[in-house]
Amino acid sequence: MIKFLLLIFTAAIVFNTNARAQQYVLYGNITDQQNKPVPFASVYIKNSSYGSTANENGDYLFKLSPGSYVAIYRFVGYKERVVKITITNHDEHMNVQLSDDLFVLADVKAKKNDLSDPATAIMRRVISKREYYLNEVKSYSSVEYIKGVKLIVSSPKTLLAREMAKLLNLDTAGRGISYQSESLSTFSFEQPDKVKEVFIASKSAGSNPPFGYNKASDLQVNFYNNLFIVDGLSSHGFVSPVAARAFTYYTYKLLGTIVQDGKKIDKIQVIPKLNALAFTGCIYIMEDDWRIYSVDLMLTKAKNNLNFVDTLKVSQQYIPIKNNVWEPLSFQYKYTGSVQGFKYSGYYLGITNNYKIDTTFRKDYFSGEILHVDTEANKRDAAFWAYSRPVPLTTAEARNYKTKDSISGLKEYTVYLDSMHHADNKLKILPYLIKGYLTTSITGKDSLYLYPLLQTVYYNTVEGYGIYLRARYSRTFDDNRSYSITPTLRYGFADKLFSANLHTTYTYDQAHAGKFFLNFGSDMPDLNSLGTRSLYFNTLSSLISEQNFVKYYRSEFGDIGYQRELVNGVLWYANISYANRTQLYNTSFNHIFSYSDRHYTSNNPLAPNAPEDDRSILFPQNKALTFNTFIKFTFDQQYITRPTGKIYLPSKYPVITVNYRKGINGVLGSDVDYDFASLQVEQDYVPMGLLGHSAFRITAGDFFNRKTLYFMDYNHFLGNQGTTADPTYVGSFHFLPFYTFSTADPFFEAHYQHNFAGALFDNIPLLKKLKLEEIVGANYLSEKINPNYSEFYFGIKRLIYGADYGVSYQGNKKYLQGFRIFYGLR
């Protein structure tokens, strides 16, 4: 099907509505009455779904076959201009001048007995038809063109800024285009929310900004929806002026009425009642039909807590398609912003053509793939783009492409590659200390990563001071195959134990998550298989706070695993492992500070009150042959297919994981004999409209055969001790001890967290500017020795940082309470 679409697309060359033997260009400039350009004015051919938009200079172009046409020129604030055009056997030049709209106040049919502003009655009629227009078109297909440009309009005079200006190829005044992009795609839609886009061509120059959209689905904005939501722009949505509850958020004022092509168009000012969640600007309504004709709205950082931009102007133009059905021809984000003294502006423009309403799709057409990127999409040449783009480039944009294309061509030369490779791979001590060091080959197919130097030296009470060396080598064969090898060396100076292991992963089918795993060697694992604290943080808590939270054991192991997506949304994983496991004891008791109210605890987590040099038995030395498998079901799994592989998107529905683990007795001397099964239901993002979003995780399990198993085989929980917690992961506890409640009996745990996404703080002026997100949550656990454990917490977060206060209970008795913080590390 994809190949078929590519053939159709190439034959049509994007925006050709009636393929004929020869096409000619209708081109010109659109100006106002002062002969100033009208940027982004809409142009379309009457009785067709073929349209375009002028560029920033008011220049436009069409490709038309010989014949007679009626072209309509439109832009918000100007009278619609209708021009008859005849294309013969040559290109036609047509400059068009638009005159200002003169909206006049007059009687409005919708007014009736409403004594308030007539706009109120008009908007009631529009809102009453909101759902009808939202669901009017059951399906359609179209061709989409997306263009984005970001300009640096001024730069600071610092040395760093000058270096940045050179990097961005700005002029001597620190101005210029830092990023531009174009894309062409086919787009398909079916009610209620099925979409599929096929990327045919893509071109960009510069680094993609954080506020960036280059695919059609990013700009499929429908104001008939209750909320206007743009990923990355804000942690919450904004109320549409025609939302079901719009009168709670807006008042309206009729500015006047004009007649366009025999239809009355009302210009209505949108006035927010609150300083958040709402637009300002104007919306244009077609009387009698009571539908949106166009929108010209704005959001500001000061009132709406926007990310990345200071202002965002949203414009949309509707045109008739057929049978009185109107759909958007063009959509535009126009923005301004500043960061570190750099001031910038830009826009994203979307043009929709070749609408085919009520299209019938194959039953399996919407299979979960919402975007398919053709392998040739990034390889289209200048001739293709010169013919296919519906909006002409400005002189500055053409020059920017040429400059950056020449730089890209330079990068193919060996000398350039060698110099850039040397610069990129230069070892820098401070980044290596904290983030590690990554070096890549000239081709980018080979890479070597050295883990952070900060993790190289560690301390715990079992090994004393130790050395931990870890690296990862990766090689990519092609877009579908790669492998990685991670060797690790570890030595404790107190217990004199040397560990060495190798973890390998071979990806053979990236598109279907097909992988093999092979791991073997010796290590010092955490008794809690979910992990408790990193080597680094356990070192800090041990030496500074005299709290040795992590408990270790010795494992000499080997395992092999496999995973693959069986069908879309069903992932299967299986592995079998063999390990010789030995209990370990404390051998070192160093610390920087001493505390009268606490001391180091035993490495036996079930003997918390034993002395630090305790040698009580937690488990005998044993051998374990273990089989583990799970199947994860993601319903209506959506994904993006790129040449480099498959990208899975968060599910709109709960994800279900069924897990089974078997301790196999008697084979290779294995001592274990148990069967464990669990069921997990989770969802990371549950939208709650203007009130933010929720997440939850519920897990239940049991050992239905528990003849022989040891502490590390138990079911463990992601507990927390100390002052740090992880609010970004719903599934962890705030106050639960790491090991105390690990169980070989039935258990049930539940976690819930709600993020209000600023819905509360946005109403408090001083707090609003901080962009804080309000968090509330609860955790629950029921198992044999702890049948009714619960936690409740509330707090704030911003990006990866957070702080909250919580309290926990065992039954009706308060257990622990206090503050927890998180700053990106655990």
PLM feature spans:
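Structured interaction patches on ligand/partner-binding surfaces of diverse proteins
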Residues: 52-53, 79-94
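Structural motif
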Residues: 22-38
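Short Pro-Gly-centered beta-turn/loop motif in secreted/extracellular proteins
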Residues: 35-39, 61-68
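Conserved "repeat-terminator" motif of extracellular CCP/Sushi domains
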Residues: 94-104, 109-113
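Structured extracytoplasmic
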Residues: 113-265, 272-278, 340-342, 346-458, ...
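Exposed, low-structure sequence patches enriched in small/polar residues
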Residues: 371-491, 495-826
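A short, solvent-exposed loop/turn motif at the edges and junctions
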Residues: 45-46, 70-83
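Short, acidic Ser/Thr/Gly-rich low-complexity loop/linker segments typical of extracellular
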Residues: 48-59
